[in-house]
Amino acid sequence: MGRSSIPLKKSEYTTTIMAQDALALMDHLGWIKAHVVGHSMGAMISCKLAAMVPERISSLALLNATGGGFECFPKIDRQMISILIRFIRAKTPEQRAAVDLDTHYSKEYLDEYVGSDTRRKILYNEYVKAISSSGMQSNNGFEGQINACWTHSLSPKELEAIRSTGFPISVIHGRYDIIARLCHARKVAEKLQPAARMVELKGAHLVSHERPEEVNQALSGLIRASEAKISLQDWSNLHGDGVDRQVAGLSVSLKRCGEGYFTCIIAILAKCFLYLIGILMMVLGHLIRILRRFKPARVGSAES
């Protein structure tokens, strides 16, 4: 994924292996306990680390997290299909930078002016420079990263190890994240009850960049709660909210369907169609990358 050596087998990329790497680093540094913060796939790795050695975790912060597997699929709509097509076609740092900006930040944030330039222009130049200096991500690295997210899950035993040890947890998420969907982050928080607090902020996938002050406040509050040994019941803000939210959502859906049954069915079918198109685009992109590995054989000119 970075500049280090890259395993050729995607099976060598798992959140468990990466959590073991993090634990080895803690041992090397002599850290008995730590406040652990993870973002996106790093949040998955942090959960695995917390499940491995819960007694060594002081607090756990999960930014823009999902539960892995099918929850890694983004919301498929016209915007996401456009992004997928642009991602597959991106061959230069400039093209990749433009795609990354739309997946990392909200449009509102990118359109804000900082001096005479928009954030989009400023960040675009920074992204192009960074990608140009480090190079485009290798296919093996990308496929390994996808494999790590796709195969990630937490067993009931692992979930119990995390939530029963006594350290507080914050699940921090951007409401406009199109990569890691907010509904899946809420599920993560609900599974980690009674230890988790849900923090929803105005931002996208890189909510820590869009809302640094709010994220820092949330992290500081988490650390203070850990040091003060606050009870988990006092820490969590999800007492019954998860179930109530699901029931409310179901009621709204049924009400809408009752008001216009065929309209509801058409809307569901449209979403399914867009979802299938998105999956097909991802498969097509994967096949294109595989075919590019095979170089055509050169045939010499026939002698007359």
Whereabouts are the PLM-identified features?
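Active-site loop/oxyanion-hole signature of alpha/beta-hydrolase fold enzymes
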Residues: 1-37
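Short beta-strand immediately N-terminal to the catalytic nucleophile in serine-hydrolase-like folds
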Residues: 36-38, 63, 172
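Gly/Ala-rich beta-loop-alpha elbow adjacent to hydrolase catalytic centers
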Residues: 38-42, 46
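Flexible "cap/lid" loop of the alpha/beta hydrolase fold
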Residues: 51-52, 58-92
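Conserved alpha/beta-hydrolase catalytic His-Asp/Glu region
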Residues: 94-146, 150-153, 158-161
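Short beta-strand/loop motif that positions the catalytic acidic residue
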Residues: 165, 171-173, 177
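Conserved alpha/beta-hydrolase "acid-adjacent" motif
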Residues: 178-184
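Catalytic active-site module of serine/aspartate enzymes centered on a nucleophile-bearing elbow/loop
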Residues: 194-304
